[in-house]
């Protein structure tokens, strides 16, 4: 595959990931504005899927480079956006909302580590 095919696959995956994240933000942020809930859930879902995919890649080398570029680099890279998370934390800290900033940071980091690990275990369970 050539560079343009790879860029096309990444772009297609990224478009779907960005639309998914935006949809989650519109749907969930109004429920818990304190937590930027849509971004949190997007990161949790993305990390869960990433854990499953990591376990799949470790288990089998049958997954093509193109598959990884579309799903991991494109879709998940766009769905789980660290820039949105960091912006939300910094906004809270600059407004002296220390508890909110620390809570968002803790939930994202610990939750994402948990869901990535859970994804690995889910894949192993079904093997």
UniProtKB/Swiss-Prot annotation:
It catalyses: fluoride(in) = fluoride(out). InterPro entries: FluC. Na(+) is not transported, but it plays an essential structural role and its presence is essential for fluoride channel function. GO terms for molecular function: fluoride channel activity; metal ion binding. GO terms for cellular component: plasma membrane. GO terms for biological process: cellular detoxification of fluoride. Belongs to the fluoride channel Fluc/FEX (TC 1.A.43) family. This is Fluoride-specific ion channel FluC. It comes from Histophilus somni (strain 2336).
């Amino acid at each position: 595959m050539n560079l343009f095919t790879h860029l096309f696959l990444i772009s297609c995956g990224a478009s779907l990931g960005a639309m998914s994240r935006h949809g989650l933000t519109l749907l969930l942020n109004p429920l818990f504005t304190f937590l930027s809930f849509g971004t949190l859930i997007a990161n949790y879902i993305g990390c869960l899927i990433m854990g499953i995919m990591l376990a799949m890649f470790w288990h089998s080398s049958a997954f093509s480079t193109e598959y990884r570029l579309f799903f991991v680099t494109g879709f998940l890279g766009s769905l789980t956006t660290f820039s949105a998370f960091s912006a939300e934390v910094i906004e809270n800290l600059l407004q002296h909302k220390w508890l909110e900033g620390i809570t968002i940071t803790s939930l994202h980091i610990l939750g994402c580590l948990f869901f990535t690990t859970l994804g690995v275990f889910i894949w192993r369970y079904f093997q």
